[in-house]
Amino acid sequence: MSLPKTPSTPLNSASTSESKKLVSVATEGTRGLPELKEKKNMVDRSKPLPTSLLNEFIPKEVLLSLTYAANAGPCPENLLPPKKIKTPKGTLPRLVDHVWHHPVRRNKFKYLIDHPVSLTGAGRDISFLYDVKYTKGQTREKAVCPPHLARSLQSHDGVIVPHKPKTLTDTLIPEEFHIVSSTGVSGLECYDDKYTTLLTDSENRLLLFPSMKPNKRVEVAQLNDVMDTMLERAGVENQEYTGPTKMHKLLHILKKEQTIYNTIFHELIRQVSVDCADRGELLSKVRERYVQMLDQIARQMIDFYKDLVTQRVMDQRILEELYNFKHVIEELTRELCLVRAHDVKLTKETEKAHKDLAQALLDAEKNAKMVEEYHDLYTLQRERMENDMKQLMAERDIWSSATYELALKVIERNRVILARRLYLNEKGWNKYTKHLIILLANKDTEDLALLQKLTQKWRNLVNKFKQEVEEMEESTRETLKIVEKGLTKWQESFNEKDILSPNNGNVFDSVILDFKQWQKMLNEKKEEFTGDVLLSKYDTLKIIKHLQENWTDIGLGIFNRHKSLEGELPSERQYMEEIIKNIQKLYKEYEIRINGDNGYSKILPILISSLDFCSFKLENLEFPDTPLEEWQEIDEKINEMKLQLDLLLNLTGIVPQHIDMDSVSVLQAYIFNMIQQWLLKIGNEINNGNIELQRHMDELHISMIQWMVNLLILMIPNFTDQDCLLKLEEESAEKHDIGVARLELDAIELTRKLYQYSRYLSSSCEGMVTAMALSKSTTSHRNATEDLYEVDKLKKECYEWINTCSCLLSNIKGRKITLLTYEEIEQLLEEEAVKEFIEPEMDESLLCSRRILLP
């Protein structure tokens, strides 16, 4: 606490007479101190006091001694510690006593300046135990509050202390209970100055030496009144003061009182030192011991308070932990109840599942027994049916062999030689047909696997070729961008006014080097469209085309083997032609992109010549005296090159718009998808074709057997000797005519089907067996032409069966029946085979027919 400052006018009046001082002191002694008023009625210090109030204050020397710290202004720069120079005259509030002019005497009274009065709140009192600055309605920063629960706010005298968020600290003691010490007053550094000393506290203020003028009893009485008044005022203020806690109020009172005692004690020491320096020094020592004792008490209080705060914190933390523990116990209890309920539910479900499982096991055992019984019954039934089938097959074989033997005997007895031959021809035709169908199926399977392998290899090569072309185009695009960027940079540099100044040097050298470098890069890219790189690309494209032709030929071979009976190719052939058409478009687009026909081959040489022209112009220009027309021509040429570069960048990776083509990526993906669908269709066509061939063969086989049986029944006479019973001639003749007519119609229809099927199968397998024979002959296979002979045998057996049918029908009808024309025979057999088979067969057929007609 500081007393009100006195006006500056009476402090600076050093020339006032001693008589005026005595009168003022006497008057003040009789009147005493005036009553202190409220703070709002305090006299304004910035204005000089009225004359009527000058005599109402304490003596000047006492007042100056009491308030010299309050009136001490900031330390001038020339009095700061690093600068030890004299204080200019005329800046001090009063003259210094002569005792301070002598170093020895000043050293004797050094205790007066060792413990100055500080008004910055840094006195050595016990108020630093609780560093808090409190004003009505708010608590300043670093406020220390008593322990409180973390989840609530406490209110003390209308002050709400907010809860700060927790932070990581380097101590276990909570931040709200830290003890913050005030900055104490440092010791004075006494300079060898005759008038001043420097108070090195927190503000480095200038401190005047205490007055050493003699004191009277009136001054002591006046000092007593001042102390009482100050204590009274402190009591009044303390009653008005309300802090957050009682500790705040107690410390506030202690601080106020200790400040007053410190100030009064300092003045007493000064007054005693005037009369007796030794007594003053003794009082100073007593004061120092007293301060040390208070300091020790304060430290003990600090320790006690720390223990108290720590205990409170521990209690608070223990309470919080207990609360948390209780909360956790409640949560665990709740979870335990839920777990128990869930456990009960699971137990019930488990018991139910166990019962269901036991019931299911019982049912399974019953079902297993039932299944076992059914299995035994099925086994018995199967064995019985197998035995029956074996018996039936044995009976069938017996009857078949008996029928065959009887038929042979009948044929031999009745001399039906052609019927036996007809049976053998049908049996041979069936054998060769089955073998060729198996060969055809195996060949189709091999070709389909090879076709899938070749198409996959072709797709891989196309993808690789596409990647190479795109990498080349990307490299070309990067080169064009570099050239365009460089041209733009130099054009902008040429447009600047300072670029051609002599101070910048000759910039043409750098430009010419860049132009030549760009010209070299573009020449390399030009070689890619005309040199060995182009030939390499064409060779790769030829390999791709050759591979595509290979799998195309394999596909055509499969289609030729699977024509319809009418000779029409399957629909997959048209689909393949569409694929080939799109592939040709793809090849054409790739050729345009690799040889530069999309515009590169025309624009790139022009661009290179333009760069060469600009380089030549720049080499011949004289720096810096360059005509404006030359610059305009170069600038126009650069603009032209930039347009050409933009056009080339737009043409990269595409073909001109006037060519009706899709994008390469889209077209290529479309082709790959078509090939995949085409392979699936070919696989389905092969399976369906082989199944259809087998079905037609089975139908023809049954039809041929049925026709032969009908022929035998019709040809064998009803009796062969006189012992047989006679039938009615009319019924026999009518039935014979109907049977002959039906036999003729069936023979004509069967002949057409057999001729068409045999010709179709032989034409489908002829190329296949020829290739197989050539392949086997190259490996020196012993039976290289066996499959080829089987095709000829198939046709021969077909022709002989048809020819035998024709002879038999001719003999039965009594007129010549022709089932095949000469042209059809030539189509079925080759010319040489026709000559070999037709004439002998005709003679033999005539002889056989004569034998059949003989009785």
From Swiss-Prot:
Stretches for region Disordered: 1-31
Any coiled-coil regions, as ranges: 316-402, 451-480, 571-596
Name of the protein in question: Axonemal dynein light chain domain-containing protein 1
Cellular compartments annotated: Cytoplasm
InterPro entries: Axonemal_dynein_LC_domain (IPR052845), Axonemal_dynein_light_chain (IPR019347)
Organism: Macaca fascicularis (Crab-eating macaque)
Major site of localization recorded for this protein: cytoplasm
Keywords per UniProt: Coiled coil, Cytoplasm, Differentiation, Spermatogenesis
PANTHER family reported for this sequence: AXONEMAL DYNEIN LIGHT CHAIN DOMAIN-CONTAINING PROTEIN 1 (PTHR23052:SF1)
Top-level taxon of the source organism: Eukaryota
Primary gene name: AXDND1
GO biological process: manchette assembly; spermatogenesis
Function of the molecule: May be essential for spermiogenesis and male fertility probably by regulating the manchette dynamics, spermatid head shaping and sperm flagellum assembly.
GO cellular component, one term: cytoplasm
Biased composition (Polar residues): 1-17
